[in-house]
Amino acid sequence: MNIKTTVCSILAVLFLISCDNQTSSLGGSLTPQGDVITVTSDSCFATSRTIKSSDSLIVMTTQCNLGRFTEQASGATIQTGYLTQLGCMENFSIADSVYGIGNHVFPQWFIDTVGTQKPYYANLKLYYSTFFGDSTNSIKIEVFPLERMIDAGKRYYPDVDPSYFCNTSAKPLVSVTVSGWNMQEYDSIRIDDDYYHSISISLPDSIAKMILEAYSNPDTRHYFNDSKSFMENLIKGFYIRCSQGDGTIFYIERTVLEVNFKCIDFDDDNKPLMQSLMAEFLGNSEVLQMNSIKWTGLEEELADNSCTWIRSPFGVMTEITLPVDDMRDDEYVLNSAMLRLSSANTPSSKFKPSIPTTLLLIRKDLLQDFFGKNSIQDNVESYIATYSSKYGSYTYNNIAAMIEKMYNDRADWLEENGKTLQNGGLAAYEQERPDWNKVVLVPVAANLDSRSSAISYSLDINMHQLKLIGGSTPIKIKTIRSKF
């Protein structure tokens, strides 16, 4: 056999993954005299279970979910709302030529009207690109003014209690019934290329009056210098929730407070003109927005040992215990470990959450830090896989580096603590680090740069449901190991 043939043969063996044990002794011209490489392909088996999703995960996204949905088969229900601050542009201003309506000097025209039109009013606009569920289903939305400031220096999680920031037992500031197919807008508007779905909520006129009075007063004009001053002195924000209805979740991308008012301006000839102006105060990435998500009825999926489940956002997730000692020992080097996770069929329904496109596989004890630091997978302690509709699975082609890291972390700890696996070291290590060999699966969404390359991953908080083969059925991991 010539050198070229030998090289090809070795490469073929190194990348071979099969279900049966195979051992080959390779030598010859590629190794020193007397050295033999033994390559073994094998299968090991991991165990898995369904666990409750961690509430202590940072949501690095501007999307806020609003609505309620009950899954027909399991009865699991998600109810979502959100808290939002409203930003004010630095050095916000209204044209100095604004004088008021009729003979009234600004702001005395607050008591006046222009024909049948209001001189001022305020709307809260909730903009969404899409929603989950029934487009004709109606839900009732309630709005509460925040009574406490959201602390910008504190981390908040999806289990945040809105009652800390406002009196959720009191009568709401306003309530409105809406559906995904916005009946408030004409069909001719919806077909426009620039159309963006929105929910418009009319707020009490007193909010517009308060803002305009504060702006017109020289002593309070500084309230509009920046967002912090605006929130501390005028509007701390709103809590928006679904109080009635079931079957729709809106994916809110932007919340805007619109203050509309009539005024008199003057043209170049100094003639008075009636004007309609609008000031906007935005809820966006520059101010805090927090999802408040609550699940009920997850007990059935948590107890189901015939499979494992992923239900997002923040419902349940799959935990896998990796057989580190079956895959790695001091005698062999682990060259490759392929993990394939196959989906299982679920009952069909008219409105069924989609299968997540991308799953993060990460060491369980690193999950919180990953999202808190706005990270990307390192292919050592975290990996990314996308769903293959052709094969109905997610494939992590090589997690050998993760197995090596788990194995070496334990070895280092045993050495530092003067223990061995044989003298109680294993039990001591597992007591101190019970999740040392555990990973979890979490739906994620990529944050892209200008070249459409992923620069980080954030939690995917859209509605997703995934049933995986596992639980009482072991998960096969195909390995290739070698030794001299």
Predicted regions and their residues:
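Secreted, disulfide-rich extracellular signaling modules
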Residues: 2-9, 13, 19-484
